[in-house]
């Protein structure tokens, strides 16, 4: 056998990229990513419902990262990190003798992939270690930053995740350069595989921008202007050095990361108080990114042939800018230079558009030669902070009030690096700030004693006698709980925010119907609480309990009595502690579990169902059994008959699967856009059922059909009920971190 493995891989890559892998070359081996997708690229990718399987975790299922992290001496860890920051290594020399600015960029870019629309991205799992993020153009040379930290990671092992280490190092860098941070929370457990469930954009080449339509309208859920960038192009839109146009891009991308105008200015100015950019030579001198680099480079990429390829010869963005005269010390130098000089356009040694101060003295130190000085320079996006009519006054105020600027940056940095961690109750370590912030979706303390099992039984009876139907109780509980997103741990039933704006007005929640149900539930709550002494039931608990009681009733009617596990202890959030604007991002534009499809969706309903199931952390069997159960319980949007493949709605039977797979039914599209279908009796032609793409996919997709066959079998009635209950309880408790 040949030992020239790299040649084999290269040949396979070449043949694959020549065109069609079947007609003009060899299909890739499964170990190279080959498989069914190359033949049927439009097929559902159910693998996103099997993320991070236990078998892939080398630490084992019993490993408790929270417990391991709490055993750390965090102060000792920080001392070790601080030593790394000022110990320059010959293989990658530190700018100004300090790796702090590099580490700030590393932490920023780890967290900065977060976007509000689906909660994906962010620093929470240390994904910067894996493709595609480890090889994004905007993450150039951050592979060196992580490699510099290996001695620290090696020393503390599994007590300190990479995900926590990246963020903590950013904090230590700021602190050792004279900045007082807002705090730090640990708790980000590592994963062991690259995320395959994040849509980063439609482009197939780096730095392309096919994500825009109309008047520069950025596609949802994306949070960056070009493929492979964290936010914006620092040269301006598509390299056009227009600070005003760049400000528009900045505002939109930072908004999609949950930052307002003040936070945006503080973050950019605070980050650019430190360090420099790198563009010492032409881009074509830079080699392959880490994923494409040769094996002997051992995961390091962007090897440069310009000069020494490092230090003063380093190339990253192609820009060559140092913002302040004290690039390793916190201060107000960024704003001072921004406002005190006028700037003219120039090209960096790499040919990138940047700005240099006109008629300015050479006051900026060189990163590697103490004998050299430079004039102040700025990026196009830096000038946006001065010239934009909204950013400009904010920047001026921060310049004139440095303490206000420092506080704004500290808070914005903390938000940036902790936004995807979920509620404050998940924060770990001695540096967790005492102050509770509204973006953490805070919940109040319980108003009374928690209800017990006897109270639960009493309330179930009252709920079932309240006049609300099984469909109404189930739909309301689902609407409340299914807002949860495993991506950033937001949403869920705890807090009963379904009764607050904006959720009570969402189209998917049928506002008029919801208002009627909530009035009845609030009546049950008042009656119970007025006569229960110290014990109080929250509306949040009552909503979930109502759904669970309805499921029990439906299961009994199907002939399989079951008790749905219920854990009391939820509380009701207040408007004061609910950022209504931030919750607008959680509004579903589609929910296949309720057969709801809003307007403007790019993907067909079955793909949107899969995406929703992924956010709910469901497996493919859980998604399947929930859809089948919710259909027969009548939980469709606006009482739609789509997918109600049963003659006994309200009874928890497996009829959805039995009738979908009935060989005596033929299906035909009933809409031009092929979103709805009718099923007719093959013998008589009589219309029997109506369904959506989110229904028929369980018969058309081979893998989902295999699951549907399990539940359609003659012996599956009881299993179906028990599996539905288990999946139902999982969704109801997704945000009950206190139960873990």
Swiss-Prot record:
The record marks 105 as: Transition state stabilizer. Its cofactor is heme b. Residues 1-38 are annotated as: Disordered. It catalyses: H2O2 + AH2 = A + 2 H2O; 2 H2O2 = O2 + 2 H2O. Formation of the three residue Trp-Tyr-Met cross-link is important for the catalase, but not the peroxidase activity of the enzyme. Induction: Induced in late exponential growth phase (at protein level). Bifunctional enzyme with both catalase and broad-spectrum peroxidase activity. This is Catalase-peroxidase. It comes from Streptomyces coelicolor (strain ATCC BAA-471 / A3(2) / M145). The gene is katG.
